[in-house]
Amino acid sequence: MEIIPAIDLLDSACVRLHQGDYAKVTRFSEDPVAQALSWQKQGATRLHLVDLDGAKSGEPVNDSCVRAITSALNIPVQLGGGVRTLERAEELLAYGLEQVILGTVAIEQPQLVKQLAQRNPGRIIVGIDAKNGKVATRGWISQSEVNATDLAADFNAAGIAAIISTDIATDGTLEGPNLESLRAMANASSVPLIASGGVGCMADLLSLLALEPYGVSGVIVGRALYDGKVDLKEAIRAIGDGRLQDPPSSKPLMA
């Protein structure tokens, strides 16, 4: 299972939101490039970027920062947030991003996502952000009546690289991932699933291993890394590809 550190960009700073609330912002770093390099140095095999300004407004506010991060790293970078047109998606891919993540457009224009996946094999990810099982869009500001599992199933044959399943209710809370929701999403789709939201400790990461046989291939970790609740090197050693048979014993795994 791949451990993917996250950098959320707001006004070119590295931040985290609590349950997607733009009024509840914690700033962790004013230098996202340095932060990205730090995650790479600690063993990250991929970086997850979110343009929060773009997600909210649809405008490419943080492009210079995105380009700087992509240029500085040797590992693949994936980006989501405000990517709502074919031209915008392919512009970002031309920056050197490995993959782009489409959320709002996946529910509003699913055919566009499928077209992009055909034009850019292996480089399109669908982001499904849900609260109480219903898909949220436009930076989590708008709530739809579409079931997250139904949307996941719709993209089974679309040729996308993966689905990122974010549980809004747990995102940024450190209270643990929604395993029931993730299992339902994995069962609904044959596409590799990346879990996002709620990871607060190593035990949470270990709990996700039970879902690996169902198709959960990775997990995005944000606040737990910044708060020091999870050590990236240790997480990769215990959970990542080539992991040990036994979890590390340097810290207690259960509270």
Swiss-Prot record:
GO cellular component annotations of the record: cytoplasm
Pathway assigned to this chain's UniProt record: Amino-acid biosynthesis; L-histidine biosynthesis; L-histidine from 5-phospho-alpha-D-ribose 1-diphosphate: step 4/9
Coiled-coil portions: none
Active site: 8 (proton acceptor), 129 (proton donor)
EC number: 5.3.1.16
Pfam families listed in its UniProt record: His_biosynth (PF00977)
SUPFAM superfamilies linked: Ribulose-phoshate binding barrel (SSF51366)
Enzyme superclass (EC): isomerase
Subcellular location, record wording: Cytoplasm
Keyword flag DNA-binding: no
NCBIfam families: 1-(5-phosphoribosyl)-5-[(5-phosphoribosylamino)methylideneamino]imidazole-4-carboxamide isomerase (TIGR00007)
Family recorded in the similarity comment: Belongs to the HisA/HisF family.
Protein name per Swiss-Prot or TrEMBL: 1-(5-phosphoribosyl)-5-[(5-phosphoribosylamino)methylideneamino] imidazole-4-carboxamide isomerase
Lineage, opening ranks: Bacteria, Bacillati, Cyanobacteriota, Cyanophyceae, Synechococcales
Gene this protein is translated from: hisA
